[in-house]
Amino acid sequence: MAKSVKNRKRVAPTRRHLSMRHRRRTPHCPLGKSKDHKRNLVRMFMEMLNAVKLYHWNTHSFSQHKATDELHSRLSENVDKFMEVLLGKDASRLKHLDKKIALINARNTSDFKTRIHEYREYFVNMNTCFDSHRDSDLLNIRDEILADLNQFLYLLTLK
């Protein structure tokens, strides 16, 4: 004879259950497996910087030309700082990097804006990859990069 639902004994969730539940609710780390974080970051940073510079060279709009130049300059500075802080945390160097990096050449402003939104989403989800206490320095630099991208998206709305 089956026990009624009311009489079933409740079992406290285990750590495994809690971590699985937590994992389902939060977006996954965009950097992939932890052993590949640095390699994936370098690839993404280089692709982003190259995409901004290619758009800078190809645009016919003077305001977009100036805005992308400023964005590239700020991103380059913040990316350099981010990677130096990251590498300084464990006194490591980059090894076994991919030899090929995609060159993303946006066809028009709409495509480029979409790409910038994708980069922004990548950085927003990056907080799932780092510990908010131990890696607050990296997350602060990430926030500066997000501010640069958001300011640039605003500047694209100007004529």
Predicted regions and their residues:
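Helix-loop segments that flank and shape redox-cofactor active sites
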Residues: 47-70, 129-136
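Acidic/histidine-rich alpha-helical segments that form the ligand environment
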Residues: 101-156
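Arg/Lys-rich, intrinsically disordered low-complexity tails that mediate electrostatic binding
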Residues: 1-36
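Amphipathic alpha-helical coiled-coil segments
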Residues: 81-86, 152-159
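Disorder-to-helix initiation segments
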Residues: 30-42, 48, 108-112
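Hydrophobic core segments within long, regular secondary-structure runs in both alpha-
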Residues: 49, 76-79, 120, 146
